[in-house]
Amino acid sequence: DGHFDYVQEHLRILSAFYGVLKPMDGITPYRLEMQAKAAIGDSTNLYDFWGDNLYWEVIDDSWIIINLASKEYSKCIEKYLTPDDRYITISFCEQSGGRLITKGTYAKMARGEMVRYMAENHIENPDDIKEFDHLGYVFRDDISSDREYIFERKTVK
C-alpha cells in the first residue's frame, strides 16, 4: 500500500517536451528526444532551452538524486550539480568478452524494476537500494562507488 503515493512523491520523469513530470501528470503523446536540434528563442538545442530548470525541479531538501535516466537525459541534471548534492547513478551491466557492458533493453527493464522495488519497499536511504536483486541483477560493491551503484546481471551459461 502507498506505492502510488511513494512514486508520486519521489519519482520524476524527464521529458524533452514537458520538462519534469510526476508519474500521474497527464500528457499528450509526442515524439521528441532531448538531443534533437531545436531553435527556441536564443537556444539552439533543448539542453540550452531547459538550462538549470530541470535540476531545480528534481532536487529537494534531501539533496539526493538517484539517477535512473539515460545519459541523454542525465546530462540535463549533471551539469548543474553542486558539492552539496548526493547524486547516485544506477548502472545495470553484464559480462561480455571479459568486460562489463550495458545492454539497452535489459537496462530499461531493470530501471523500471528498480522503480518498482523502491516503491514497494518505500526506500528513503540510498544504501537500501543495494539490496535490489530483480531480473538476475546483483549489486557489485567491489566496483561501485558513492556516485555510481553498479548492478551486474548474472547470465545462465
Which sequence ranges carry the predicted segments?
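Internal, well-folded beta-alpha domain core
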Residues: 1-146, 150, 154-157
